[in-house]
Amino acid sequence: MKLKLTVLLILVHASASYKPPAIEVEDYQVQEHDSIGKFVELEEHTRLILKCSAHHNGDLKYNFPSMEGNVGYDENNFKKRMEEYYDDAFGDKVLTLNDVRESDTGTYSCSSMEHSSLNDTIYVFVHRKKVFLPLKSVMIIYKQGEVMVPCKTTKFVDKSDIELYASNVLVKEASKYNYDQRYGFKITKKLYSEKQIVDVNFECRYKKEENQTATYIITEKEASSDDGYHFSWEKGFQWPHVGYNFSLTCNLNYNGSKIFHGYTNKLSIECPQCSHDPGSHVHVDRHRIIGNKISTTVRIQHLELEDSGKYTCIWEHENKETKYTDYHLYVAPKKAQIKVIETSPTIMRIKENRATSLTAKFAIYPFEKESYTAKWSRIYNSSIHEGPQSETIINDDFRKIAATSFGDGAFSENLDIKAFAVSTNMSGTYVLSISHMDTVQVVQWEVAIENDEPDVQITVREPSSFFISNQEYYKPDTNLHIECISISIPPADVVFEYKTKNSEQFQEIEPNKLVSVGGTFDRGLIYNVTFTEGMDLKCSSIRKGNRAITVNKLIKIGEGFEVRPHHEKSSKATESEPSKIIYEGDNVKLTCVFPLDSDDWSVSWRFENSKSSDISSIPTTTETEIKQYSKHLILNLRDVTTSFTGTYTCVVKNEDSEKLLETSIDVKAISKPSITGGNSNAVVIVDYDQYFEINCNMTGTPPPVYQWFKDGNPYTHGDVDGSILRVSRARGEDDGEFHCLATNRAGDKLNSIEVQVNNAPKGSLFFYWFLALLLLISIIAVFLLTCKLRASNRLTKQKDIALNTLYETMIKHQAGPLPEEMKDLPVEERTYYLPYNNDYEIDPVNLEILNPIGSGHFGVVKKGLLGMAYPKSKIESKTRLPVAVKSSTNPFNVELQKMMAEELKVMCAIPKNPNVLALIGAVTKNMRQGQLYIVTEFIDGGNLREFLQAHRNTFINELVEDEHVPVDDSYLVPNSVKKKIYKFDEKLGEGTRLLVEDPDALCTSDLLSIGLQIAKGMAWLADVPCVHRDLACRNVLITKTKIVRIADFGLSKKHTNKTYYRTKKSKDTPLPVRWMPLECIEEFKFTQKSDVWSFGICLYEIFTLGGTPYPNCDTFNVIEFIRNGNRNKQPEYCHDEIYELMKVCWQFNPKDRPTFNDCITFFENHMRDSSSQFLERVENMLHTEMQEQSKLDDWIQDSRPDVPNVSFQKSPKKQKEERYLIVESHA
């Protein structure tokens, strides 16, 4: 038994060892054809890579075609372009042929050096322009016998497209049977009718392209005396079938020059059922001699299936060797037949995204009858579904089916697959089923489509229905059917892993919990599990050492992702309102539901409608609720208006995904009830004791509630149906005026209808007494209203006098000299003594106020256009300067106007500086009518905080860790700590990254420049002196060229009252405590040193790109946090030296803090050390900005000289004035 097993193993090993090698081609489609085998087509100057692999351990070698006769072949050049080596990873012998040439066309083979019989071949076509391969010699001399006309091709062509001409005469039979793309035409005497081939011009032509020909001169040596015989079967009936009377003749022809002796030759036919008996089923005639020809015929009466087989004709000669020729007869079982003539390669291995086509040429019999039908399909095995899967192929965007008729029953079917549809999952067996009458013929192609790397997929299904859900979120105890599938040709190994929330590394799922599956183009693993906790899944596909991976996350959730709208009616709503319609004044609550399982969710709300895409444009509040497996982010919309109409999107994001959950609300505008039909005080005439109805003729939005009154009392004798009062019986008391009161949340409206009841009994005088009383009440009400209006007029007059007094004292009146004891006070604390410079006064005619661009507690800022007060030319008269126009929120509030006037006088007292917002002028003369406008520069970049936040995604960090370890290894500077240094872009040159012109770019050097500019601006204010009191990035403006302006320093004094800077825990009071030192919060003491503290906070905002100070500390705990000695941590983009400056600014004792001049010196030294050109460029830009700022006076003052030889007088302002030049602010 052991001996038998040993022998069996040896045989198995020997069988594997003697398996021939196989050639694969990289990057090109390998095709196969019945006549020439495997082949590949290339264009000239591309690269050919062949890989030869074998199962035995012997050496492999490549054999090359004979190319010496090809035009352009050079042996040395071929060797230079050719490279052979072994692939150590897989043991393959690799042949690389670079820059392939047309002359490289031919058969390449790979064989075992130990067993040369083990080999594999592939024919390589290399095409340039010519279809026929150019040869060095076109004169061919052959010996007696068959001749090859060597019209080889440089690409694979259909045989029927190549024609052979001999002396310009078409050789018709040559193309059908005797052409091979590798060698050319095989010429026999049967094909060529001339007696001898002597210096004949043969020409090969390609029918599909003009001028594609090849010409050869072929000559024949003189034939010997033994030649001249032609022995063959005569062509018989092509469609033999059961019941047909069939005959087949064998001929021997002599065309030689000698005398033919027929008696020396004998022909006979042999077959299993052959007989010389005339009555037999298969009868063979005796041979007949006619001239130089001998023939014998086999005759079969009523063909049967058993007559199929080999029929042999035997030629016997006295002086020659006996010769044989065979004819293979196939008897079809039916008359209707289909024969496949030619197909495109039936085994195909191609690359993805390369167009391909499948073609079959066939003939049908009898073709006079009904035509054929054809059906294309694809059969493949799926790793998911059991059994073979079939797909019927039709014409669509990916595949095209075409049919061609050649006549005489010959046809072709073609399936073209477009390049973008050629993917690995389209592999399989492609089947063409041809039906003709009662016969079916099937042609198959095995198509394997290789991909560069496996396509790995994780699919989650519900097991009972196999419905693909592929969601991330599932409720606990859900049964899941999870597939890890790799779509790959060649096949790849699959690994399925998982990781729970509590584990750090992925680990393989236990094999006994997995089911292995496979198909034509895919392999995979199936994991059936009951979902209990969140997990990460990883599916890996490994092929030739390369790994493709996909990861999926399954999260536990109690509720699905959704937005739930909830609608609460206004307290003013009436019971008649439709419950589902949202009206102005209602409250809406939008609840965004998302998972609790993960902590890295970022959830926010977006809002969009036709007018706005910013949710800050509408007042909202948010709150968060935590459920068992979910979180709820609730957006509260209170007292909604039509501006709330739009789409609300809850944006739920984490590192891997983003979900947009949308809902829309439509807020209907409300309108007070109004009369819509008929007239007020209409008259309705009714008959006593009869039915009548009256219509209120009023409507509103929402639909109002209707109440009816008669003689001042509610009317209770009828039924109210909407706006109609239905009365079943008219009474005498119904005579008179009815009142209808329509009420909704927008208000109410009263309408009166007079009802006249005919034939009613006379009533009492009570009604007239009631009218008299009503008239008396009306007179009293008019008297009271008159008194109230007179009181209101007195109040308005008092405000008018107060505003005029304010103007006289604050603007027009110039106070005396400043007392000595007040000279050291900040400028904002001595505003009474500050003069208002009338040179700043702007004529309202020159100022056009546009849309609002910002607002605060006390003032509102609008964009404006300023015209020149004293233009020197027509162009200047039509030029407009964009400006910012500030006014109070209530122009008739004396206290607010006083604050505005004080701010104006403070700004007048501060000289222009490129880092301080400049005053252009003001409108003060109409303060009595509420017109007090402060006109400043228009800064196009907005406030600094929003600017920094907007550039977070595009920020360029120029701060890196120093790779050099410091020498000093003290406890202050340990070697383990690496310092941060600047690394500016070397391509741009040193320091040139500063203030780049691209507004979308922001880098570390820009942050340094911004910090220096704020220090310069605050130092300028400190020299006035002026204490800002509210320095923060929100109060710093920035231009698109990254020049900053300190703003809102004029109103700072008004915040010293304790209603603004109190520390009471009230969320309704704005408290900038995150920017203030303790002495400001607790003692309300504001100095330049408190501004320095705020400057340090500003630096923190800058280097966190708009971050909030003390981010992990609640607002109400900030004071205690600071008091305990805690400070902000060092920002990521902040240099160590900058952070040291911040900490000095945050010293508890104000005396220990630096001055702003100290801060300027620090920044200049720091920037100078970082870059030799850095500081210089900043100073140059600020100098240019100062020059531009000084030109602002030209817009309101007559300080410029007239234009020479130009006389111009400003025309009166028109209602519609042409403005063809708008000058943007230099900022």
Swiss-Prot record:
Q: What is its main location?
A: membrane
Residue ranges occupied by any Protein kinase domain in the UniProt entry: 847-1175
According to its UniProt record, in which tissues is this protein expressed? Answer: Expressed in the ALA neuron.
Topological domains, Extracellular: 18-764
- Please name every pair of cysteines joined by a disulfide bond in this record: C52-C110, C204-C313, C592-C650, C696-C740
Catalytic activity annotation? L-tyrosyl-[protein] + ATP = O-phospho-L-tyrosyl-[protein] + ADP + H(+)
Record-linked SMART domains: IG, IGc2, TyrKc
Name any one GO molecular function: ATP binding
Signal peptide (from-to): 1-17
Q: Which CDD domains match?
A: Ig, PTKc
Residues that bind ATP? I853, G854, S855, G856, H857, F858, G859, V860, V861, K886
Q: What does this protein do?
A: Receptor tyrosine kinase which may be involved, downstream of pvf-1, in the positioning of ray 1, the most anterior ray sensillum in the male tail.
Q: What is this protein called?
A: Tyrosine-protein kinase receptor ver-3
Q: Which gene encodes it?
A: ver-3
